[in-house]
């Protein structure tokens, strides 16, 4: 038995952070253990550095930036695994799908090793932000052309996500409707898949959450090849 990893994805400015925090608070009010992790995470050195680049405070090559984001995601493997072992619903406000979509917009291939495939992904679908910023306030990647390219990349990536692990929601829907859809589906996914012990890594290996030692966090010892993991077969995942 373990918790679940929920990803909320989409281009900049479509309400991901709002929905992620609302989901966390609603779950806690219903006595579920829930935590929200934002990427980039401003509370870490790596995340803060990425945000400085995005806010155009410092410069960095595109290749360095995208590789740094993937490294940043991998820094949270032990923390996410521990939370899953403790039966938390872990909500990630952006994750590896964002890393891929944004890197591909710059024609860059990134390493996805040491990252998880989310148990379930909510994709807030929109080609443009709900409220466009003035040019002077735009962060890196927030030009109209770049966001449209990133949106196209997202749609291609999401086409490869198993349909029973993905919910695409028009970002222009009423916020209350979006929240209700996300909350209802998250609870259903959690309640229907409480028997899971493994979580799939992006390289198609598996991490045995139940074998994780919370005292040493040596999660590498819990990695197994993808044989005999019938309990985690995509066709058997219940939503």
Curated annotation (Swiss-Prot):
GO biological process: dTDP biosynthetic process; dTTP biosynthetic process; dUDP biosynthetic process
Residues noted as binding ATP in the record, renumbered to the chain: 10-17
Enzyme class: transferase
Pathway: Pyrimidine metabolism; dTTP biosynthesis
Alphabetically ordered keywords of this record: ATP-binding, Kinase, Nucleotide biosynthesis, Nucleotide-binding, Transferase
GO molecular function: ATP binding; dTMP kinase activity
Swiss-Prot/TrEMBL catalytic activity: dTMP + ATP = dTDP + ADP
EC number(s) recorded for this UniProt protein: 2.7.4.9
Functional description taken from the UniProt entry: Catalyzes the conversion of dTMP to dTDP.
Membership in a protein family: Belongs to the thymidylate kinase family.
PANTHER family referenced in this protein's UniProt entry, alphabetically: THYMIDYLATE KINASE, UMP-CMP KINASE 2, MITOCHONDRIAL
Protein name, entry field: Thymidylate kinase
The organism of origin for this protein: African swine fever virus (isolate Warthog/Namibia/Wart80/1980) (ASFV)
